[in-house]
Amino acid sequence: IANIGEIAANVICGNGHEGKAYAITGPELLSGTDMAKIFTDVTGKQVDYVSPDEDTVLNSLLDSGWPQWQAKGMLELFDLFASNQAAVISPDGEQLLGRPLTTLKEFAQQNKAAFI
């Protein structure tokens, strides 16, 4: 999250960004299981990735007030991620930041106190 804020500040305050679009991604491709393992390793507490079925997700969204069309659209987005169609790493973030992006493990280590 800090990377995104710093990138945004660089674009807003810097020159030469007018009319440009950037693909900002993280520095690594991680599954939910990968992310859970990172948090388990960093915190020493077991973290499990749980992927609820579509009906559970849909009902949860509808119960929290989402319109049906929007909830269905969110399920489509989740399917896109689950099928790895969005599994892309772009160099834009690192180029705009001028240094390597923070990995999830680095983020978890830097913010460990917030997670334990």
Regions found by a protein language model. Give the residues of each.
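A conserved structural motif in NAD(P)-dependent oxidoreductases
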Residues: I1-N3
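Short glycine/proline-rich, acidic loop/turn segments that cap or connect secondary-structure elements
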Residues: F78-N84
